[in-house]
A protein has these predicted regions:
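Internal gly/pro-rich beta-alpha loop/helix module
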Residues: 154-258
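Acyltransferase
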Residues: 224-258, 273, 288-292, 458-492
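Phosphate-binding active sites in nucleotide-utilizing proteins
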Residues: 283-345, 349-356
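ATP-dependent carboxylate-amine ligase catalytic core
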Residues: 27-140, 148-175, 183-188
């Protein structure tokens, strides 16, 4: 396979599964599938996964993308490329049974599933690599395409690949994709070394090209929803895959484990009713726009399954709240859009008034920041909703980054005292709680046993019917969340 010019543009770990129960479907319900992994982060996994999704979707295949871990941003790019919502598979948050169930359910009508790994192939929660991408691939009996950064290396690439092949028995690396390849001679030397010493095919090559870089900023990649350059970025990845990948061999590798036909898998998926309710029992507003885009599809589906009608609100454009029984404000980048948020005075005033009148509100990270009095970034300060008596200060480095473990220690609208929750946080801000203890009616929902939260010990500000925290929760890891929120909305 020789390099060529780009082609022209063409077309707590839960012990129950709740309404996601799939019985004994397991691997027999899986479609052809691939895990896109790498020896380390920033090797090109997202570019490869995005390019593959775009090419296969353009061929007319139903492509179901997945992302390992709790990330929101990579899935936004995969969603756009595949033309189908990406779903997260998080071994640490969900556990094996729920991950397998979620994969079977999410891919039940797909022709192929593309699973993008996280960090290095064997990186996990601890020294043993618990919950790694390799473990996920084994759970799903999925072949792995290893993306390797080939900059400034030739024969030594074989040692790197071979080490990944042998490190954990049962991990099935089925092919290699080379990234940052300088020229045809470089590619030839790399390919010969891998084929001779690793007995693996090189099924794709990405040339050294800045156009194949997806834009990023202070918290990683920029979400596709707020990035006007997403079309050329996805097109560049697609064209590189089209020009430099052996797509037929890749499809062969994906299908080597077999799997049921789409019709049979669809019937299997029919065993997974979202809801037995004939009509919604409450209306929940969801602020979803360029400023707030961090929502797991399963969270929205779980709310619907519990009986909610979802009504979407744009915090940047909508002047008024619709008629709703509760409000859900997910994460995002309010610090980037503080001017627009500040300018929408009428909506901010209505949200604050609704909270004072008892509207149930659940907010995560960016949503917490929006409910505060203000956001300060350097010498800039933006007025926010002001429902919570605290201020947000942006810093130059992560304040909380990674998994969190929480224990419910205080009264709150959703969770019983003593409950233990697992979630994720990733924020460059801190909350100034000066004077917090002197304000009546405020409480703290969570004690932090792992992670940062508000101050390393606490998370989850409670005020009236508001629960706002830095922690992001996933409905498959916290199955009681959706039903509790809908019940609170119904109760008013």
């Amino acid at each position: 396979m020789e390099m060529s010019q780009y082609a022209n543009e063409r077309i707590p770990k839960p012990d129950r599964l709740a309404h996601w129960q799939i019985g004994q479907l397991a691997h027999r319900a899986f479609p052809p599938r691939l895990v896109i992994a790498a020896p380390q982060g920033r090797s090109g996994k997202t570019t490869v996964a995005v390019g593959l999704c775009a090419v296969l979707a353009a061929r007319g295949l139903i492509v179901q993308p997945f992302k390992k871990g709790p990330d929101y941003i990579d899935p936004s790019w995969l969603t756009e490329a595949a033309r189908r919502s990406c779903r997260n598979l998080d071994p640490y948050l969900m556990g094996k049974d729920v991950v397998v169930a979620a994969f079977a359910r999410g891919s039940r009508d797909a022709d192929i599933a593309i699973i993008e790994g996280a960090m290095g192939l064997y990186d996990g929660f601890d020294l043993e690599g618990t919950d790694s991408t390799a473990a996920l691939a084994r759970w799903l009996d999925a072949p792995i395409l290893l993306v390797v950064n080939a900059a400034r290396v030739t024969r030594s690439i074989a040692a790197l690949v071979q080490g990944n092949q042998r490190f954990e028995p049962g991990t099935r690396i089925a092919g290699v994709i080379l990234n940052n390849v300088a020229r045809e001679r470089h590619q030839r030397m790399l390919t010969q070394a891998i084929e001779k010493y690793c007995d693996l095919p090189v099924v794709g090559v990405l040339p050294r090209d800045d156009s194949l870089t997806i834009p990023d900023r202070h918290l990683g990649l920029i979400p596709r929803v707020e990035n006007e350059t997403h079309v050329p970025a996805i097109a560049a990845a697609r064209d590189a895959v089209l020009a430099h990948f052996d797509l037929e061999r890749i499809l062969e590798i994906a299908g080597e484990q077999g799997g049921r036909g789409a019709g049979e898998r669809r019937r299997a998926g029919d065993q997974l009713p979202i809801s037995n309710l004939e009509s919604p029992i409450s209306k929940i507003g969801v602020i979803r726009d360029r400023a707030f885009s961090f929502y797991y599809p399963e969270n929205l589906e779980a709310l619907q399954g519990a009986g909610a009608e979802l009504i979407f609100v744009d915090s940047l454009r909508d002047a008024h709240l619709p008629t709703i029984d509760a409000l859900y404000i997910g994460g995002g980048f309010p610090e980037v859009f503080w001017r627009e948020l500040q300018a929408n005075v009428s909506l901010r005033v209505e949200i604050r008034a609704a909270i004072e009148n008892g509207l149930p509100v659940y907010a995560e990270c960016g949503g917490l920041m929006y409910l505060a009095r203000s956001i300060t970034w350097g010498d800039q300060r933006g007025e926010m909703v002001g429902a919570l008596p605290c201020d947000v200060v942006m810093t130059g480095k992560p304040q909380g980054h990674g998994y969190v473990e929480l224990e419910v220690v205080g009264e709150n609208p959703l969770f019983a005292r003593g409950a233990k929750l697992r979630g994720h946080e990733f924020h460059n801000s801190r909350i100034d709680l000066t004077g917090f203890a002197n304000v009546s009616g405020l409480g703290i929902a969570y004690g932090v046993t792992r992670g940062r939260g508000l101050d390393g010990q606490r998370d989850g500000i409670v005020y009236k019917n508001v629960l706002a925290s830095y922690a992001h929760l996933h409905a498959l890891a916290t199955p009681e969340w959706a039903s509790a929120f809908v019940a609170r909305a119904k109760a008013g």
